[in-house]
Each structure stands twice: as C-alpha cells, then as structure tokens.
Amino acid sequence: MSNPHSNNSKNLKHQNFKGQNPKNLAPTKALRIAIFTDVFLGIPGGIPSSIRAQKTSLEALGHQVTIFCPGTQQDFENPLSQFGANHDPNIILVPTAKFLVNGAPFSKWTKQVVRFIEGKYPNLTESFDLFHIHYEATTSMAGLILAKKYHIKTVQTMHGREDMAIAINVPHPFKTIAATGINLIHRTTLKSISKKSPRPDYQNPEPKKLPGLNYQNAEIKNLAPTIARREMWQMMTRQANLADQVITPSAHFAKKLRLFGVTRPISVISNGISDQEIANFTPRIRTYQDHEPLRILWFSRLSKEKRILPFLEALRIAQELEPNFRFIFTIIGDGNQMSKVQKFCKKHFDEASIKILGTIPHQEILQKYTKDQHLSIINSYQFDTQGLTILEAAACNLPVIYADPDMSEIVPNHGGLCAKSPAPRAMAELLLEIYHQPELIQKLSQNLAASEKTYLQSHQIEKLLKLYRQLS
C-alpha cells in the first residue's frame, strides 16, 4: 500500500531492511536494554502486546531485556497472563499504587520509582547500554530522569493520542482540569532535565530551532481545538523531545508530532505482531456467500475510544435499511462499556446475532476465533496511531473495515475498506455494500494473502536494532 505521507520521507528516518535476516544483524556484543513503561503487561492490548513481542524477539537474538513496569505479584497470577513477573526475573515491578486506573495497576510517584530502581541498580551505567521508554507517565518519566543522570541514551516510542484519551474519556466539565493537571505534573517532574533552548541530536550537530506554535493554523486547530487537547499535545511533545530518538508506529502520527514541535529524529517502526502467534496455523482465503450471515469479529477493549457502541448502532441501522441483512457479531474483550454493550444488544438484536465472549487468551483469538470470520472491525477515530488489530487480522487474511482514514496507511495491500465518515450510518452503508457484493470478501482476503509480511516482529526488530546500534 502506498504511504499517504511519503513526501515526508526525508524527515522520517524510515529505512527498509527487506530481505535481511535479523540474526545476521545481531552484534557481537549483546545489548543490555531497559524498557520503562506505565502500561500493565498482564492485559490484552496493542501496547502491552508490542512490548511483549519486542522482548521476546530481542532475547531470541541474544540481547538482555529488563522491563520496569507497574503491577503486583497477585496481578500476574491471572491464568490469562502468559507474561507473568512471578516467573520472569527480568520483569521488575516498580512501586505500585493500591488504586487502579482504567482497571489496571498504576505506578506510584516518579521520585519513588527512581529511588526504587537506583536501590536495585546502584550504577545503571554498568547495567544497561540504553533505555527504551514506552509511555509518558510516572515510570516513563523515571526512565528519562535516570537516563539524563547516568548519561544513557534513550529511545522513546510514542504510542497513542493522549489528547484524544482525555477528550473521549473524561466528563466534559473536568477535561480542562484533568489535562492541565496532568501536563503540570509532567512539566514539573521533568523540569530538572528540560532545556529551554533546543539541543543537537546524534544525527544533526546543529540544533533545530523550536518554532512557536500557531494555534490558528488550520491543521493545528483541528488537532487541538480545546485547551485540554493543547495541554496533552504539550505533554507528548515534551516527552518526545527529551529522548535521543523517537519511534512512532505510523507516518501519520509522526507527521502530527512534527507539527506540534517534536525536533528529535523520528523513525516509523510498526509495533509488529509476534511471529509465534501465527507460527502454528495457516490462514485461509475468506469467502462469503450471499445466503450466509456476515460474520464480523471484534477483538479489542470495550471502551469509548474504541467506539464499540457506534458500531452496534451501525449494525442496527443496517438492519433497518435492509431487513434481509443478517450477521453474527462476535465480541472478544472487556472494558468499562461492557454493561452498555450488553443492554444495547439485548434491546436491538436477537441472541443468534451476537456472541459476547469476554476476555480470551490472545493466541487463541488468532488461531481459533478468527477461523470462520468474514470481517474484522476497528471503529476508533483519531485515537489509534496504528491499530494492532488491523495487523493481527491481516496475518489471518481477515479483511478489515474501519472508520478512520488514517488507518489506510496500516492496512496491508488494500486488504480493507474504510467508511466514508465515522458516523454509524456511514459504517452501516459500508456493511450493506459488502452484503450486496459478497465477492469483495474474497478479493480483500486475497490481497492480504499476497501482501509482504513486514508487520511481523521479526521484520520490525531489524529496524529497531539499527537504531539501537546508532545510539549505543
């Protein structure tokens, strides 16, 4: 698939290592990498999945990977967690608060995390060659502070649109208060290592001058129309500019970060999916007959930002527009909208049309529950920077329908279709287009089968190691 932002290739250090074996790239000296993240690794989701896959791939090449993350031993005793800290000595659980944030453990204040890590590793310089940071909250800030103190190079992966997380999830009267408070804590915590003047980077000895942001600029105004969203963009930009190297999973997100003032070198490297997840099965080409119900799979959080309820509304509208339209919608996942999903389905659909399965071990989803499906759905809009669900579906030759045109960059080889707008009616019309043209399913599935499997972690790790070597 062509890259809609390919004209920015000079700015984005997106290099191609096609055809090379990652084992041939492994240095004679194994790297010692510390990963800092605020994401709880014991839950499903794109970020924890990518961190797990990154750790597995690097260790397979002989590198040492230590992860600092929140959680307790009890959290990792969940049988669904195959990445438990109770049996992996290289997963270090930092001081963790007793309360949960969005149902997941959250680390304590940055100072406490810093003290804990320094107590465990008195001389970090002798223990690690570089840091890789995967978020922007307390543990991630601890990584930046320790990196500056011990002169260790840092890679920062910017995963998500935190501005949209606030805009979608925080009730209206509190959006500005929450965003301003988060940005204030972030700015204050990192004040000691922040520089007012731009600094050179390892690729360009001449520092780039930070331009003043013009919030009347149409593109910036569209991305940051409120004070709350401006505050979160400031936080994301600050975090990125304190690293030596920035990674984003997509070119469209890299472009937005540049727009808001990120001056550090940016590389576009997909989060990738684990090779092991698809190693033991051969996906088939999907076909859809016009007498069949359209089988659609959702495997993601049931949350506002993922927009499960607008998709259910699209299904309702599709049935209203075409009474003969039949479907079976399988929902895998859990989240704070589960009860609303159950109520909506009970009110509008018969039991045969909906299967709510809850949380299922990740590998089982790909190898078992995708088998008889026609479509996968990712319905987020201006939130996901990559959408790992798209890549996982692609690995199964399962066509994808989606609402956000930015996701077209991610869908391999035209293996999906985008609705004309994020409105439920537009998605309903797309569903009916497929219903009336069943041959589309086979065509899209064949496109995915013919695509290069560059989304596998084994391919992405080559690019990551290239960056690591430039820094270490």
Regions found by a protein language model. Give the residues of each.
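Short hydrophobic beta-strand element within catalytic cores of glycosyltransferases
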Residues: 395, 399-402
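Conserved acidic donor-binding segment of nucleotide-sugar-dependent glycosyltransferases
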Residues: 413-424, 433-438
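Membrane-proximal helix-turn-helix segments that form the acceptor-binding/catalytic region
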Residues: 179-245
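Acidic donor-binding loop of glycosyltransferase active sites
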Residues: 244, 370-385, 398
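Nucleotide-activated donor-binding/catalytic signature segment of Leloir-type glycosyltransferases, i.e.
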Residues: 340-360, 372
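N-terminal subdomain of nucleotide-sugar transferases
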Residues: 2-5, 23-82, 87-89, 93
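Carbohydrate-associated surface elements
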Residues: 252, 272
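Conserved donor-binding/catalytic core segment of Leloir-type glycosyltransferases
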Residues: 288-315, 330
